């Protein structure tokens, strides 16, 4: 792919990097070991910004990301604004699902914190399955954003028809609903500002020869249930107390989840979808529970995305070594499995010829180790996991916030020595 109308050295590098990634993803040997840059707050720290500044200063974060990409020279990057730059919008919404730096006493130096809570009670399962959009509008959004509580008063439109639609307009004149709608407009304007900076940065990095490696996000159905609806306690109890309801919800989610990712990728003119997983790790579910409540539904999501021409990059957080023989059941050369603590050598043995493997330089090594430690670990990964291709070098869950710059530089620089 050329950048602009003329062939430039940067456009040649862009095409080479893009091809290097695709060769690895599609299980061919690239010219050398490819890398992707993914982080939350490390790129901000690398430029002297704290976490609060990263979440509120769109232009400053763009400059930090630009510096990190230029210095590290990865073959692809995941845009950082889409991960952290939500501070002003969350302020407007009075958002409830996170605490973030400078908000309610959290230090400016601390990353945002996820708040585990129940946002859908057990007797609402059927309501969500029957009318997910209505549930999200009337119940979920008012629960996760204080400024949107009045949306619970909106008309129940499936039962409001013909002239009653006209009569229902009265609801929008209520002061509290007007305030909620004005808040949505204000929040939308703020997100437009952030997206504009992000889009400009992606284009600038493209001109410099660096492709984006994430064009949308998606989820596993069980993670949606546990992270965003029932909460961890509710989801764990439902594995035993509400099995049929939980399975019904996840079957519904297999059709609800993919369209958002497909739409995002189309808007970004890209084909890589990032999927962080939280509940598929060893030790949480038994093998039988995993093959009942997690994998079949998630596999359907993956296959739908693949059929749409997309390449899922699945971040398997924690240790998932015991799942390898199950999760290898996907079309060859269409998925990337990004491992944190899974045994990479067993993963290569199980997934060779089927899935591209990404990872997994440990966070602890990047934070407390030395560049020589990093280089030695990367060499082991390249020699074994990189054998025959199908491997992308990265940190275990992306570059950790506290990683030493010299260790991060060592990882990315060493990859350029790994020639096939």
What are these regions (language model features)?
Residues 1-420:
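Catalytic cores of TIM-barrel enzymes
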